[in-house]
Amino acid sequence: MKKGHESSSRIPAGPLRSPDGSHDPRSRAPLPVGERIGADTKHTGRGITAAFLDSGFYAHPDLTTPHTRIHAYYDLMSGKSGLEPLEHPDASSWHGMMSSVVAAGNGALSNGRFKSLAPDLGLVLCKVGTLSRVHHDDIARGIEWVILNRARYDIRILNISAGGDYEASYLDDVMSRFAEAAVRAGICVVAAVGNRGDKPGYVVPPASVPAVITVGGLDDAGNPSFGRVTGYRSSFGPTIDGLQKPEIITLADWIPAPILPNTPTSKQVQLLAKLHRASDEEIPKILDKHAGTYAPLDEARHQPVYLL
């Protein structure tokens, strides 16, 4: 967890504040999720273990500092297990890293500011896809693996931030049957409804399963006090079985989330942070030194500093 964390740099002091202490609308920095929804901080997930199915994962410091809360990792695609692969992320790791840290991160890299709603939650991570695809049948296999390992890791929650390849009735779809079986086994299954709000009535398994708690989204512009709460592009029912989904909507945009180390995005963020701290005299030299990192800055680097 030493090298490769440069892009997960510590967050400076929080967003701008008005004289009365409220969030200053001039600041683009979003408030932490807990502040935005008025979460009760006494509920931290302590003693609870949740499993996550996603395309890949990374052992982010917010999950491993001061001690790891990742109890197990299983790669369904290769059959490999053990925590060591989490130290070497690839491009497929970003989505699961974000979903797990947003759900269970303790804010270690932001001095606790951007901690999740469940900073003490234990995790079991199961990779069920690649960067390009998460297949319907692989999600089903992942749910089956969680059921088989429920007692071993005391799994009480299953989060699925992926969806199947097609609409299907929960009465005869294999993935849907596994999701129902997980609930019968005592696991609370939660699934994202999907991002097909442009296609009404399109909800795929596992989000379409009656026993699954399905979650959609809203956009509060980063702060509810702005008074600009709008709908997100979430999918919505009725499902192919005539069921209304989702059951819950919550924040889906302006979510403080980590960036995967050693990726083009992480290098761009490091450059922007360096420029933010630099004096006017230092900025041209920094831009020349990091040419090729971020195309918009390459195009603008010969302009006067005050125009950047």
State each model region's role.
Residues 128-211, 222, 240-243, 296-307:
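Substrate-binding/access-modulating region of protease and related hydrolase catalytic domains
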Residues 102-106, 142-149, 182-185, 275-282, ...:
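Structured segments of extracytoplasmic/periplasmic soluble domains
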